[in-house]
């Protein structure tokens, strides 16, 4: 029984560590992907196009879970949206 609990705990830890990053996906201009006035499921589809595991509308922008490390994610510290 102890081994089963240890095994399950290890699997959960691996999922947390390997789960990927999360955040607001950035478009080619560095802006968040908007979900203002979009259909239900839009953000989940957009996130999956960027190889994320899932996503939802955190109004007014999409938020993704399980993004690959190479995915571009919006960051307030390096925000270039609307700047020249």
From Swiss-Prot:
Keywords recorded for this protein, A-Z: Amidation, Disulfide bond, Secreted, Signal
User: What S-S linkages are listed for this chain?
Assistant: 31-81, 35-57, 43-62, 47-64
An individual GO BP term: defense response
Compartment(s): Secreted
Q: Write one Gene Ontology MF term.
A: sodium channel inhibitor activity
Which tissues does the record link to its expression? Expressed by the venom gland.
GO cellular component terms given for this protein: extracellular region
- Domain (LCN-type CS-alpha/beta) ranges: 21-82
Domain-related comment: Has the structural arrangement of an alpha-helix connected to antiparallel beta-sheets by disulfide bonds (CS-alpha/beta).
> What is the role of the protein in this entry?
This protein is not toxic. It induces an immune response similar to that induced by whole venom. Thus, polyclonal antibodies raised against this protein can neutralize the effects of the venom.
* Record's protein name: Toxin-like TcoNTxP1
Provide the organism lineage as a comma list: Eukaryota, Metazoa, Ecdysozoa, Arthropoda, Chelicerata
């Amino acid at each position: 029984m102890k081994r089963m609990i240890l095994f399950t705990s290890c699997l959960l830890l691996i999922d947390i560590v390997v789960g990927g990053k999360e955040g607001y996906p950035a478009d080619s201009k560095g802006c968040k992907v908007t979900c203002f006035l979009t259909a239900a499921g839009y953000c989940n589809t957009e996130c999956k196009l960027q190889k994320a595991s899932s996503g939802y509308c955190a109004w007014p922008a999409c938020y993704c879970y399980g993004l690959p490390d190479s995915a571009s994610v919006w960051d307030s510290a390096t925000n270039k949206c609307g700047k020249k």
